[in-house]
Structure formats: C-alpha cells, structure tokens
Amino acid sequence: MALPRNVIPMPRSRFLRVKCIDCGNEQIVFSHPATRVRCNVCGATLVEPTGGKGIIRAKILEVLE
C-alpha cells in the first residue's frame, strides 16, 4: 500500500542558480546557507545567512530540484 505524499515531509530548501548583479557570473547556491556566499569572480555577496532562509542579493535564474 502506497503512502500519501503529504505523510512524508519534503525539504523546503532548494539549490538556486543565481546571477551576480555586479559582474554577471552565474553560480549555484543553497537557499538556506550557514555562511555568507560570495561571487567566485568579483567577491560580491550573493546570499547572506539569517538562521533560516538566506537573504538573496542576486537575481534568481532557476530553482533546481
């Protein structure tokens, strides 16, 4: 017997493909980071931790499954 989907909780965190506003670099980041995520090219802050969902300071291009 199959269990209904709502019985098994799904994670609310996702990986995101974001684009840096300063240099245009595309990078994959986690939606609930524990540390500040910086751009690999210019060093600008892309995501800041808040203890839960991070503050995203870049343009979200895609939500990855």
From Swiss-Prot:
Transmembrane segments: none annotated. A zinc finger (C4-type) spans 20-42. InterPro entries: Ribosomal_eS27, Ribosomal_eS27_Zn-bd_dom_sf, Ribosomal_zn-bd. GO terms for cellular component: ribonucleoprotein complex; ribosome. One of its GO terms (molecular function) is zinc ion binding. It holds the Pfam family Ribosomal_S27e. Part of the 30S ribosomal subunit. This is Small ribosomal subunit protein eS27.
